[in-house]
């Protein structure tokens, strides 16, 4: 059963669990559970995704309730006429808010993009970010006697594939749990010490003008047990007041 965080006659939004594919994909031919099919069965009607959320990322995911609504609303999402807010735990301490303007080359999949042009120019990619809290743990990693982590709030201003994960890695502050762009030592530390098996990236909030009511709409998704446990462990509850 998916948690529905918003629904009206046009749109429905869920809190996507980490690790769940949005729809059937060649990425995992053996997977049997998908957000689209689960939500369709749950509400008894077809749904049409308006944007994407990577498999390991949790949080707000919005669907249209008809193909016509999807065709009318999708340009708004494609043109980034909304404000997305994510939260993440990253390696190291970031001391101040900033905006990273760092172009990214398109990441191509070996199978799905086999015939795509391989030498495309990097595309504009902009991310606003700010640190919310820090922690220093008495756990040695490499030559360091302690390890430092930071709770981050991020707002992507463009929509490149894996943008937040790649931008944080570029800053040398990879997101914990990122098996592609992250740091295996710290991913393993979180698995072994905190039973955190997931990517610590959550799509917390989506703000946009409702395409039919023309009223501002704010959709929020709460944090799962892994996130809640880490906030408690690190004393970060007051830094990130999102309802579970």
From Swiss-Prot:
Active site: 54
Reaction equation(s) it catalyzes: uridine(65) in tRNA = pseudouridine(65) in tRNA
EC number from the UniProt entry: 5.4.99.26
InterPro entries: PsdUridine_synth_cat_dom_sf, PsdUridine_synth_RluA-like_CS, PsdUridine_synth_RsuA/RluA, RluA_PseudoU_synthase
GO biological process, any: enzyme-directed rRNA pseudouridine synthesis
GO molecular function: pseudouridine synthase activity; RNA binding; tRNA pseudouridine(65) synthase activity
Pfam families named in the record: PseudoU_synth_2
Family membership noted in the UniProt record: Belongs to the pseudouridine synthase RluA family.
NCBIfam families: PRK11112.1
Function: Responsible for synthesis of pseudouridine from uracil-65 in transfer RNAs.
Name listed for the protein in its UniProt record: tRNA pseudouridine synthase C
Organism: Vibrio cholerae serotype O1 (strain ATCC 39315 / El Tor Inaba N16961)
Organism lineage: Bacteria, Pseudomonadati, Pseudomonadota, Gammaproteobacteria, Vibrionales
Gene symbol of the encoding locus: truC
């Amino acid at each position: 059963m998916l948690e529905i965080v918003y629904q009206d006659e046009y749109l429905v939004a869920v809190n996507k669990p980490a690790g769940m594919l949005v729809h059937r994909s060649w990425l995992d031919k053996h997977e049997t559970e998908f957000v689209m099919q689960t939500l369709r069965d749950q509400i008894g009607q077809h749904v049409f995704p308006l944007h994407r959320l990577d498999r390991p990322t949790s949080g707000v995911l919005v669907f249209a309730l008809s193909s016509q609504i999807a065709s009318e609303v999708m340009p708004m999402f494609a043109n980034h006429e909304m404000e997305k807010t994510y939260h993440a735990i990253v390696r190291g301490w970031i001391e101040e808010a900033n905006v990273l303007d760092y172009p990214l080359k398109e990441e191509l999949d070996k199978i799905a993009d086999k015939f795509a042009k391989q030498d495309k120019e990097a595309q504009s990619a902009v991310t606003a970010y700010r640190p919310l809290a820090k922690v220093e743990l008495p756990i040695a990693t490499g030559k360091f006697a302690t390890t430092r982590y930071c709770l981050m709030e991020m707002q992507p201003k463009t929509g490149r594939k894996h943008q937040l994960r790649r931008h944080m890695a570029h800053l040398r502050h990879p997101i914990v749990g990122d098996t592609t762009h992250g740091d295996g030592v710290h991913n393993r530390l979180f698995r072994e010490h905190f039973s955190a098996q997931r990517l610590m990236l959550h799509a917390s909030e989506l703000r946009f003008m409702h395409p039919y009511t023309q009223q501002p709409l704010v959709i929020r998704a709460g944090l799962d047990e892994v996130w809640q446990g880490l906030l408690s462990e690190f004393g970060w509850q007051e830094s990130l007041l999102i309802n579970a």
